[in-house]
Amino acid sequence: MENMIRPEAVVLADNALIPPANLISPPPNQFTHELTVGQPYYYAGAPQDRPPDGTFAAGTKVVLLVYNGGRYCRVADRQGLYVETEYRGLQQL
């Protein structure tokens, strides 16, 4: 097309990809908890002196899938993202 300006193509770094083990398909459509505050999440377990893999916004609805009474739990959001985050930031719906 004439007069169309296209942005320069950019290749994302490998860490921009979500590991297949951290995606649930189909994603959940019913939720058990909501995050009361914005908080980080991790793909491969609790942090070991490394930055978080992402952050949930306050109000994000999730399904609580694994909780063994400790500081962290495993949840899935509406996009099927299966991650570990702090349990204390969750509120039951």
Language-model features, listed with the residues they occupy:
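Compositionally biased, intrinsically disordered low-complexity regions enriched
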Residues: 1-2, 21
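SH3/SH3-like beta-barrel superfamily modules
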Residues: 3-10, 17, 57-87
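Beta-loop motif signature
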Residues: 18-70
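Structured surface patches comprising rigid loops and adjacent beta-strands/short helices at the edges
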Residues: 87-93
